[in-house]
């Protein structure tokens, strides 16, 4: 329990997808739906499937938030986001709407996905510049930003500046509500 969310395996000349339901990955949960779509991504992407089949790629236990730096995992995440948040429908849902955190929360509920998965999809196909930062204990683990995000260089890896809201949170343990202007 808790060791992985999903894994795609090839053994005995068969593919199988393992979903860790003990880790909150039920079929109707945001995490479970996305995990299943992510693992299907490994099967759908020819290079992943063939590499697993030939033994060039070892089965990798996917864990939410710990995979985004790995290009193989990002490829599978992209396929997953396309499956659970189709581009045309997603763009129809955002057209004419003001960008703020409430929009991301609305889309997250609409598509039954996590807020982070929804924000990353927004960075891929949305209509407003956005950067997503994932950090643990004040250390940046990964970032994702839209092509039109102008301030990519403001992030000072690996530590978060205390001048950012996230930095204030890690430095002073102060939770700050974000307004649309801060975004």
Language-model regions, residue ranges each:
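Active-site hotspot residues in diverse enzymes, especially metal/ion-binding acidic/histidine motifs
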Residues: 1-183
């Amino acid at each position: 329990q808790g060791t992985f969310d999903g894994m795609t395996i090839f053994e005995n000349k068969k593919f199988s997808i393992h979903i860790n339901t003990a880790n909150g990955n039920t079929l109707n949960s945001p995490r479970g739906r996305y995990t299943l779509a992510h693992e299907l991504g490994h099967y759908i992407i020819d290079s992943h499937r063939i590499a697993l089949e030939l033994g060039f790629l070892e089965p990798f236990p996917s864990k939410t938030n710990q995979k985004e730096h790995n290009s193989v995992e990002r490829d599978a995440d992209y396929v997953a986001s396309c499956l659970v948040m189709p581009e045309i429908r997603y763009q129809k849902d955002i057209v004419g709407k003001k960008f703020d955190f409430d929009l991301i929360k609305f889309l997250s509920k609409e598509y039954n996905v996590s807020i982070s998965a929804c924000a990353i999809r927004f960075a891929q196909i949305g209509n407003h510049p956005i950067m997503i930062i994932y950090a643990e204990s004040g250390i940046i683990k990964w970032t994702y930003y839209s092509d039109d995000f102008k301030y990519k260089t403001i992030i000072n890896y690996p530590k978060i500046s205390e001048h950012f809201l996230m930095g204030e949170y890690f430095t002073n343990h102060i939770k700050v509500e974000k307004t649309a202007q801060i975004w």
